[in-house]
Every structure is written in structure tokens, then in C-alpha cells.
């Protein structure tokens, strides 16, 4: 099933390697000090165990459900295991992923939105922006989250909020970070 999803990966990879992080070239608030803003949401699908307890079948089903949620939009899909070493390095250098994984990487055209499946949580959504743009990036990620929730049901609790594999990420599942030039 997965190889069929990612036909043409090499042609899409030329986009990633030739046009690295278009969002970074844009101007942002206080961009002489704050180089970039990254807002991340961690989500897990309801009715699936957390990553450490998942079978390979579970992971494929999660990948498939997430693919279905994003395929109507203008995103590119990359299966980590099928990427060349240089393409993996591009994703690592762009702070999209780290280390070895077997994730599916989902990017929009300018790489300002990047998602990973089945790494530490079922879905990790990141929005990148040049400069100090926390509010702008947060609005963008929440809009995407609402759109995805029309198609996917996330694990949540009235007492604890969104459930994640890391207790620090439970609740809103939101993390905001900035990269600064000091």
C-alpha cells in the first residue's frame, strides 16, 4: 500500500532539494534577531495505541488515515525509508525531522507546514515562519488542525485535553519555539 502512495517521490524530491524552505526567505517581525518561529501540535488518533505499542499494521492504518485527510490538499508525501541520504539530510537540516525514523513526511509547497506520522505521536504538525511570528504561526496551525479534525478523530480527554505519548505535550499539544541570533 505505501509504495503506491509515494510513486513519483524522486520527482517531488527535486522540489525539496532545489527550493529549500521558501518560508525562510520571507521577511518577518524582528527578523534581525529572531530568525524563525516554529509552532508544533502533537496529536494521536482515537482508537489506536500510542506508537510504542503499535503493530506495523496499526502504523500503516494510521498512515493511510492521515494520507486521506491530507490528500485533498496541495501537499507532497515522502516516505522516509525511500529517501536518499542527501534528501534525509535536507529534512534534518530544515528542522523537520531528526535521527532515524520510519515516518511519512507531509509538506506543503513552501515547506512552511510540515507533518510527520508515527514518530513520537501519530501526527506531529509543524508550522514555520520567518522572524518572530508566534501568533501568525499559531493561527495557521490551529486552522489546519480544525480542518484535519473534520476527517480524523483525535484522542482526547475532558480532564487532560489532547492525549500524547509525552506528558509535557498533553493538553493543547502546542509547543512554540523561536530560533534567535545572539
Language-model region placement:
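Short glycine-/aliphatic-rich beta-strand segments at the starts of folded cytosolic domains
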Residues: 172-182
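Long, Pro/Ser/Thr-rich low-complexity/intrinsically disordered regulatory tracts in eukaryotic proteins
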Residues: 1-159, 166, 174-175
